[in-house]
């Protein structure tokens, strides 16, 4: 089989409400995942052994990389001994709250299921995905907006697209999920709103009065510890964004814009400050 190249897209979180802490130490949450046009590229080439290389030398290419863990998990599950050479062109920043590693792992599961002719069902792949990480099932199973609960692995396809221009900015600060969960300010006593009808009203009816409900519970602690990240959010709002928020556990921040020219201006302003950025057109979905 000839080498195959596939795009692996990032996501943002529209609202991230941490609802409880389980006895096993994991936190439950409710969030809306939305895809953005920021992607890594993975190339799969035939090989007798399982190997990986990456354009970002800061990332491991052994079993500490989710891509390799995904490949080995599928091998073991299927009893497969076939190899593959994986080349990762890394563009999505890590430690950004954009799910880049999870997206790459999901792409590996899906592609190697075909590449190796494993023919595992989506349900079987879901089990492997959950073991790899809470965000991996979203990238494996969804193309557009999805509501997530549990640890982020219980998904509901909303069949919606965000009708706005989205500017996403990485403030060059790497924040680990472990750090974020250790430092966030719990509000477990709060009654969380149901985000599903709110995002439906936002996307289909243009109802923006609901945007205040889309809080990110990591944001206050992240902003207190990293004021530069807070400034990025304010800069997006000052540039014409009608809503801006931290994505995931950060440090990436995104803003919604009505006009493409305003989004382009904000993008250029952020790039002039040395930040990596992306812009996503309205109604975007993950089509590899």
Curated annotation (Swiss-Prot):
The EC number on file is 2.7.1.148
User: Which InterPro entries does the entry mention?
Assistant: GHMP_kinase_C_dom, GHMP_kinase_C_sf, GHMP_kinase_N_dom, IspE, Ribosomal_Su5_D2-typ_SF, Ribsml_uS5_D2-typ_fold_subgr
Q: In which pathway does it act?
A: Isoprenoid biosynthesis; isopentenyl diphosphate biosynthesis via DXP pathway; isopentenyl diphosphate from 1-deoxy-D-xylulose 5-phosphate: step 3/6
The alphabetized list of GO BP terms reads: isopentenyl diphosphate biosynthetic process, methylerythritol 4-phosphate pathway; terpenoid biosynthetic process
If you read the UniProt record, what top EC class would you report for this enzyme, in one word? transferase
Superkingdom of the source? Answer: Bacteria
Q: Which UniProt keywords apply?
A: ATP-binding, Isoprene biosynthesis, Kinase, Nucleotide-binding, Transferase
Task: Tell me the residue numbers annotated for binding ATP.
Answer: 93-103
- UniProt keyword annotation of Chaperone present: no
Q: Which GO terms describe its molecular function?
A: 4-(cytidine 5'-diphospho)-2-C-methyl-D-erythritol kinase activity; ATP binding
Family per UniProt?
Belongs to the GHMP kinase family. IspE subfamily.
Q: What is this protein called?
A: 4-diphosphocytidyl-2-C-methyl-D-erythritol kinase
């Amino acid at each position: 089989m000839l080498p195959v190249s596939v795009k692996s897209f990032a996501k943002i979180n529209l609202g991230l409400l941490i609802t409880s802490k389980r006895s096993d130490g994991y936190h439950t949450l409710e969030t809306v995942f939305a895809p953005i046009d920021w992607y890594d590229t993975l190339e799969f080439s035939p090989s007798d052994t399982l190997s990986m290389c990456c354009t970002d030398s800061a990332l491991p290419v052994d079993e500490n990389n989710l891509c390799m863990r995904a490949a080995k998990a599928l091998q073991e599950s299927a009893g497969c001994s076939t190899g593959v050479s994986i080349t990762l062109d890394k563009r999505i920043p890590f430690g950004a709250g954009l799910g880049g590693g999870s997206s790459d792992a999901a792409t590996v599961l899906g592609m190697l299921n075909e590449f190796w002719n494993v023919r595992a069902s989506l349900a079987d792949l879901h089990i492997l995905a959950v073991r790899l990480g809470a965000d991996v099932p979203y990238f494996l199973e969804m193309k557009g907006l999805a509501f997530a609960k549990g640890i982020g692995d219980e998904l509901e396809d909303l069949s919606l697209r965000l009708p706005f221009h989205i500017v996403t900015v990485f403030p060059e600060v790497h924040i680990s999920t472990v750090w974020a969960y250790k430092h966030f300010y719990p509000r477990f006593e709060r009654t969380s709103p149901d985000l599903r009808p709110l995002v439906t009203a936002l996307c289909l009816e243009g109802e923006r009065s609901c945007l205040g409900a889309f809080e990110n519970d990591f944001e206050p602690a992240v902003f207190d510890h990293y004021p530069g990240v807070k400034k990025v959010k304010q800069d997006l709002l000052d540039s014409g964004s009608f809503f801006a928020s931290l994505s995931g556990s950060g440090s990436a921040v995104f803003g919604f814009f009505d006009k493409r020219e305003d989004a382009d201006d904000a993008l250029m302003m952020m790039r002039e400050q040395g930040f990596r950025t992306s812009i996503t057109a309205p109604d975007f979905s993950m089509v590899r």
